Amino acid sequence: SRWDGSSKFQKENRWGMFPSAALAWRISEENFMESTRNWLSNLKLRASFGVTGNNAGVGPYDTQALANIKYYYNYGGTVANGFGYTMINPDLTWEKTVEFNVGLDFGLFNNRINGTIDLYNKNSSDLLMEMQTPFELGSYTGAIISNVGKVNNKGIEIQLNTLNVQTKDWNWETSFSFARNINTIKELNGGKEDLVGNKWFIGQPIDVVYGYKYMGVCTREEAQAFANDPNMKTKFYEGEMKIYDKDGNGEIN
């Protein structure tokens, strides 16, 4: 277990405890595996659990107000010095990731063939991300760093290495790898409400893209038909891309 501190956060959120543990079982060294030792060089099962903290993306003054006199404002034709206002978030804290990993290491024929298989499950909470905010709230950047929600990452990683030829003068080795990760947003701002402005949707990956379904290019005849159709609230013109009207009400929204 370890304690980490960061001066980027306020005093009450500065320190975080991040425990971890790991164990392994070298199965190939057990007595009941003695008959396999002429071809099985290594077989090890391992498991680990750990909590890690992240403060990347947080600036040294994101929890403290700054005054900057380099901003100028026009008041009735008179230019005056002013203070650029940056929104702060004094409640920022560590982003935490709890990870559980199970892995298998193996080696065959004096490790001429060897590899690893890893399964992992990560749950990240208090994600530190830039959240879009209306300019009228006082942020000239339109964004503020916040602890916004929870995300799950789970997947598999496979690595296979082979020593195909080994001579006094040269070796021929090959490596193969495969990885698959599934990223899912579980919670945002303590609830199940999507943050559309950030492209964050519950049950979907971070920064998933939603868009209209296009049905091809509008022809001259189709454009005339759209123009003459009183039920068609959204008009398409010649050369434009036609958008699929999912609910059939004549309006794209």
Regions found by a protein language model. Give the residues of each.
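Flexible glycine-rich, low-complexity coil/linker segments exposed to the extracellular/periplasmic environment
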Residues: K70-M87, F201-N253
